[in-house]
Amino acid sequence: MVVVLTIPAWGQADSAVERFYKGNQVRLIGSAGPGSGYSAWTRFIGQYLGRHLPGEPAVVVQYMAGAGGLIAANYMYSLAGRDGREIASLAREAPALSLMHAPGVRYDSLKLNWLGTPTSESNICVVGRNAPIKTLDDLYGKETVVGTDGIGSGMHMFPVALNALVHTKFKVIDGYSDSGVVLLAIDRGEIHGACQSAETLLHARGDAIRSGDLRVVLQGGMRPNPKFPGVPFVLDLARNEEQRLALRFLYSSQTFGRPYVAPPEVPPERVAALRQAFTDMFRDKDFLADAARQDYDVNPISGDDMTTLIGELAKTPKPIIDEVAALIAPPSPR
């Protein structure tokens, strides 16, 4: 008697993926400077991801900062290897910037392989204790000088859009190397404040926020953040449905938190393995305990769900997308 053993296709794929990654290195690219909240998360992810990938490859973190994350996003789309050994942390605004065909964008967010995000977030605008901005009304009546880490980042996009849509008076100063340097500029009194990830600010300057050295004057996202009761919520500032839809599209990027991607054209079985590794890592008790010790909120979204959400975002009416794109576009050279 001859016994034929049939190995399921998924088993063969798992074995092939393990053979590929075993003894290899995975390059994890950080798209922001080393002092930023993105990079803190990237280093943290780099400590745990390899143990959840088949073959347990070493994960090496390298930085490719600049232009609010666009340099890394463009690299991942056009130049990164397609074998699954290069992945990256991108700016949460990356999907929206692609859909808006923003200046400097040379990637298609619908073709990138989204792997997951450890957290969904909100954006808050903060000012230093001595800034002349005390209330929401002051944002309309007084110039508020805010710093950013580049025109491709939310630190730039949100105040610019708010100026156009609801007539705040933010003066935006671009060109700081990363969000950590922006915070130092607030400390030195060079600028009044910044509009930045709530998680980043709570992690880096939670004591200052609690003491009032940094004051939260506005919050934005898909819903109010319960950590900031009584702070004005950006969607409530909309004066009509068109403004509300535009603000909702712009702030939808907060949902993506700290997104991780692989390039297009990576073999599907390796994309699946990378996505599963992120999902397993987000459930890892050691990972969760370590995150809690460092005051990181873990509220993950899977790569599959991110892909679905970005597809839904792409269905936003084109006039709304075009309006938001026009709001955040840099001025034409004279």
Q: Language-model segments: which ranges?
A:
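Bacterial N-terminal signal peptides
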Residues: M1-P8
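Cleavable N-terminal signal peptides
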Residues: A9-A13
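A short beta-strand structural signal in non-transmembrane regions
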Residues: G257-P263
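An extracytoplasmic/periplasmic, membrane-proximal ligand-sensing/linker region
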Residues: K22-N24, G212, V217, V266-R334
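Structural beta->alpha junctions
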Residues: G33-P34, P263-P268
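Conserved hydrophobic/amphipathic secondary-structure segments
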Residues: D14, E18-G257, A329-P333
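A conserved hydrophobic position in a structured secondary element of the catalytic/binding core
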Residues: V127, P229, A262, F282-R283
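Generic detection of intrinsically disordered/low-complexity segments and helix-coil linkers/edges
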Residues: V4, D14-S15, Q243, M281, ...
